[in-house]
Amino acid sequence: VGSGALTLRRAIIVAAVFEFCGAVFFGSHVTDTIRKGVLDFGDDGFDKELSQDLMYGFMAALLAAAIWLTIATKYGLPVSTTHSIVGGVIGMGLFIQPDSVNWPKVAEIVISWVASPLLGAILAYVSFRIIKKVIFDHDKPLQRTKSLAPILALPTFFVLGLALQFKGLKGFYKNLDNNGIIEKEEWLPCDPAKYSCSSFNPFSDSAWIPLNSFLVALFIGLIASTILWYVLKKYQFKEEGYDGVERVFIWLQIITACYVAFAHGANDVANAIGPMAAIYDIASSSTGILSPDKVDVPIWLLLLGGAGITVGVATWGYKVMDTIGTKITHITPSRGFAAEFGAATTVLIFSMPFLAVPISTTHTLVGAVVGVGLAGGAAAVDFRVFGKIAASWVASLPVAGLGSILFFILFAGNPTNVAIVVLLSIIITIYVVIRADNVDDESLESVITSQPFEQFHEHARAVQKTVECMNNAINSAAKGEDPSKYIEETIALELEADIIKSKIQGEIGSGVRFAIGRDTFLHMLSRQDRIADYAQNVAEQLSFRTLFDDKKARNNLMEMATAVLETVDSYEKAVDSLKELSQSGFSNKEKNLLLECVREVNLKEHRADEIEAKAAAHVFSTGDDDALAAMHMYRVLQRMDDVANACEKAANAFLPSLSR
């Protein structure tokens, strides 16, 4: 959404569909009795008293995690559902039986807070640097994309195919194995508890990547590469240059985003409803004792989990989309694709037996977004936002853990207490939702899909129109005609430019992050707006009285107006070049082109200075008979020179971005 690949509404629909399908149709039908192995009660099994405590403990853990996730999502913090529930389980385990906590497993989870975002950032950084070097630095980026995209699609979709099987379809393969349809060892990475797991050879029994999964992933890669080649061959691009390149990456990003949503639904949702399956197992058991090993996950629980995540995405999902898509760094389709590919590759690596560390897809994706931002320089990343996100990750375990202890105490093993506490929690949550700020779809869409350089370009066009109207006013006055119409239009156009500027300032102030620093961008915007301000001053100066009645002086004035307009036109080309520079990931080629545009603006401004000096000299040499009119003509020339000078300063404000 932040890259503009999909509108907010369409993104919500796509995410909801793939999350739901992943959870319901490919989620695991069997789950561990103690989620992720963070609790270990020994090999003696569970007695009735312990099972009942665990049932209420799991209820408390789920409620605590749900409240924490609600609070975090309300403030747009992308926290891990799985880790929040694990935190709740750890808390209730400490309270019920302190020595039951498997601290080495907890340590693995804590390590994953650093390891998965870090690796995701590195892979996303490298991915985008390769895209930038191979495509954006090329003289003809669109043609380069058409020729290379099918080749790049093969390894990309091969990795996605493996990650989909090992992360998203893991539960599905286990279901088929339980039903005697397949042997899961032939499809999933080998289990370190059963094999040595030391071979890359797909034909080995201890292969990290089994032959079946390898062939399926290769088939997916070949099919995707072939389809992309055919589509690019037939598709008639309306966009040129970098816009056309981003059009290709929009397709790729949508596919990778669908994978992330599907894998999250298939794996993470199943993890989230694991404690609920344990509760159901205890409550439905005739003995009231928890199964010691595995429990079945009823289909209605998978439906419940899928429905829950669908509602979550459709209600407050936009808040997290806003944070990841706009507030961390500037995202385009190519950057978004690199981030999602980096995240998918990280998930694949951590699913290998030589690591086998439980990681969060959410944490990994955030790290990948930071990595893509760093590819454009440290200034492109808002580390304050990332710091808040990281703090929320660290807080997930203790907050959910303490919350589960509190709720477990309030439950007191009494179903009536459970009903009262849960009901009050639901009422409070609904109240918070109702009290949430109402957000208009259109304004929200514009904020989340906001592209600052697009808006900057829109403001530049408004400024250019203001100067063009000012030029018409000057020519009209110089010809002895009434310039009132053009004067009024100039003032109105300057007001429109101010409105656009204020809108941009408001959105930038709301936390949108992009390729250069916020202060630098606002300085550039302010410099650009002064061009329109000075054009308005020229128009107002014309309204004071008629021009100096001298033919050569008036011709000089029109020549000056033409020079000023040419300076503004050159500045507009520099703005176009700045936009291209941003789209290219600040490639060296576009830096050189922008530098040439800035030099051209400076040359045009110097030419305007020369004409202004010539025109002023003529006015002062011939204006003795009507000194007041001559002084008025000089004031008009000065204000016009201000417009040209403002163009020069606005263009020079682009230069710091060339040092990135």
Question: Each PLM stretch: what is its role?
Answer:
Residues 1-443:
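Alpha-helical transmembrane segments and immediately membrane-proximal extracytoplasmic
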Residues 441-660:
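Cytosolic, long alpha-helical scaffolding segments
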